[in-house]
């Protein structure tokens, strides 16, 4: 906001912005318009950001997701491609790949999850910072894919709380970016602090219901699937 000063009829220094700051004119009338137009309230709205603390925290979290540099098989190639200049994942604030799970809050399960690898993934997930999120990328991570055998876990959600599923074999980098945007929307709409409660074991987070479970009956009742061109 700009402040200007001038001299009155008696030679006294007067501020031409003071009536605007007080919100009243010299004769009790509404303040004169500011240089940008509008009243004092309008000037405050243009120059001061107002909001709730939980909204500011949600805004900061959704645009500063730190993914863990972790991959399993071919889907990791598409994940790595999303970090190149062509797709530019930095637009969404998630370009900071962390080399240790202790500095990350997002893990992307990109590839086939073998039974021997599941305990390792769970161990890495337990070391991540709270709050933490999981993206299941590709058909193998979502449901085992084409490997319906004893050595492959049939879905990463059998041992991890998956937040977003990205379909495809393998999914394009664009699909991963769309999944990241869905995760950001979920993070931004999360209630705070009502989503955390103090229980017998300390602060506990109320788990959101899984859309996979909520839409299970709807998917089972589907008689026909749309063609890939119509999706």
Curated annotation (Swiss-Prot):
It is found in: Cell inner membrane. Gene3D superfamilies: 3.40.50.12280. Signal peptide: none annotated. The keyword Transcription does not apply. GO terms for cellular component: plasma membrane; respiratory chain complex I. InterPro entries: NADH_UbQ_OxRdtase-like_20kDa (IPR006137), NADH_UQ_OxRdtase_20Kd_su (IPR006138). Belongs to the complex I 20 kDa subunit family. NCBIfam families: nuoB_fam, PRK06411.1. This is NADH-quinone oxidoreductase subunit B 2.
